[in-house]
């Protein structure tokens, strides 16, 4: 939510979300609240792409290999107006700024295992604004209000529900990305 807010998304924008894991899907939901003209999600996992098509049919999807050309062809200014990088790989960090149009905003949501470098000579002339959009609790009440009002529906993301006594198995399921898991809800009444 924080990342979508600081990205200054307008209704005329083409927004690219790179990565459709659990955090990427939550980012997508928050971007959708801003009602941009066009949303593109870059993802390589076919299950995640099918999930997006099933639940968010107005969202365009593309593979990383085709992303740059696809975004250029499906935007009004030769690239995305806003890019949210949620995947967290060196290649996706590079893809983020490559897919951004000149004067775009690139918001980094991902947490990287290694420091990323900005190849300034290659970026020269793009005049990009980089922002970081990690977790910030200042919007928690607003997020809860949006969920309560039905404006932010996270229920499709909950693919598994487990009793509290099975929390270790649930964590293992989530960590190893088995059985199409996106999010696991823990039911404390089923102790």
Task: Label each region the model flagged.
Residues 1-65:
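Mid-domain Rossmann-like dinucleotide-binding core that forms the NAD(H)/NADP(H) cofactor-binding site
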Residues 7-9, 49-50, 54-129:
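Glycine-rich cofactor phosphate-binding loops and adjacent beta1-alpha1 units
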Residues 10, 34, 78, 152, ...:
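Structured loop/turn residues at beta-strand edges in well-structured enzyme cores
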Residues 16, 40, 105-107, 131, ...:
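Structural detector of well-ordered beta-strand residues that form the stable sheet scaffold
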Residues 94, 98, 137-191:
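C-terminal hydrophobic helical "lid"/dimerization subdomain
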């Amino acid at each position: 939510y924080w990342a979508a807010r600081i990205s200054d998304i307008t209704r005329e924008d083409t927004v690219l979300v790179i990565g459709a894991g659990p955090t990427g899907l939550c980012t997508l939901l928050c971007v959708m609240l801003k009602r941009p003209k066009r949303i593109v999600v870059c993802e390589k996992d076919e299950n995640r792409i099918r999930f997006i098509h099933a639940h968010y049919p107005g969202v365009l999807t593309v593979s990383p290999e085709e992303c740059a050309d696809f975004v250029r062809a499906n935007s009004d200014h030769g690239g995305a107006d806003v890019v949210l990088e949620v995947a967290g790989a060196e290649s996706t960090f590079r893809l983020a700024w490559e897919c951004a149009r000149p004067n775009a905003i690139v918001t980094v949501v991902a947490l990287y295992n290694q420091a990323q470098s900005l190849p300034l000579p290659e970026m020269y002339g793009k005049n990009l604004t980089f922002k970081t959009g990690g977790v910030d609790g200042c919007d928690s009440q607003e997020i809860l209000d949006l969920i309560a009002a039905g404006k932010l529906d996270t229920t499709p993301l909950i693919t598994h529900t487990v009793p509290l006594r099975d929390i270790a198995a649930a964590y293992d399921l989530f960590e190893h990305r088995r059985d199409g898991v996106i999010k696991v809800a823990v039911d404390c009444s089923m102790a």
